[in-house]
Amino acid sequence: MERVLIVNADDFGLSKGQNYGIIEACRNGVVTSTTALVNGAAIDHAAQLGRSTPELAVGMHFVLTLGEPLSAMPGLTRDGRLGKWIWQQAEEDSLPLEEIAHELACQYHRFVELFGHEPTHIDSHHHVHMFAQIYPIVAAFAREKGIALRIDRQVAAQSGLDQQAARSSAGFSSEFYGEAVSEELFLQTLDASIARGERSLEVMCHPAYVDRIIMGSAYCYPRLDELDVLTAASLKAAVADRGYRLGTYRDV
């Protein structure tokens, strides 16, 4: 049975080092897809690289935790900026859902302006679209636009979210992350998906070259390790040996 593997590199547009790492992992590795932060410091650079790398599918990385929003969000920003206090607001059930829905539309339109096409799919920075209050908004938007959505099946099940609310891959893994990233860890995510009988799987990753912006991230040097693993010839062979075809969200 053929299986589809989507290797999605998050954070396109975060920095030039991030952008170059993603392009390298696509051209010389197993990365097939990326998602872009339209308010990122290097988003124009990302759009330029994306146009010269047509084999890289580009989706939208919805941002509610970093930088400045594209629209006025007085209910979520502090001093005009987004931040991780969104978790506290979610726990307090005080999220400004109308503002979030409007910002989602603004970021979508900005994506189309930058890249010249619709995103292949939507996910989000720090997985905020999987919050119980935000998920229905993003899922309905993706369905309306006819595009796919990253769905973390485990989180959705725990939160009682409708897993059929939007088109998605059968499985999703965020486990290729952290100080211990390795080829073995990557392949373990594939083997676990095979054991679950999933015909399609998205593996999240963050390959990058380190620059000043990345050095300011809590997740820094492992991005280099990810790049090494994702561009290893042995990994591509092992993926094929397991019956996977490298693909994108257009294939699900």
From Swiss-Prot:
It catalyses: N,N'-diacetylchitobiose + H2O = N-acetyl-beta-D-glucosaminyl-(1->4)-D-glucosamine + acetate; diacetylchitobiose-6'-phosphate + H2O = N'-monoacetylchitobiose-6'-phosphate + acetate. One of its GO terms (cellular component) is cytoplasm. Keywords: Carbohydrate metabolism, Chitin degradation, Cytoplasm, Hydrolase, Magnesium, Metal-binding, Polysaccharide degradation. One of its GO terms (molecular function) is metal ion binding. Its cofactor is Mg(2+). Homodimer. This is Chitooligosaccharide deacetylase. It comes from Klebsiella pneumoniae subsp. pneumoniae (strain ATCC 700721 / MGH 78578).
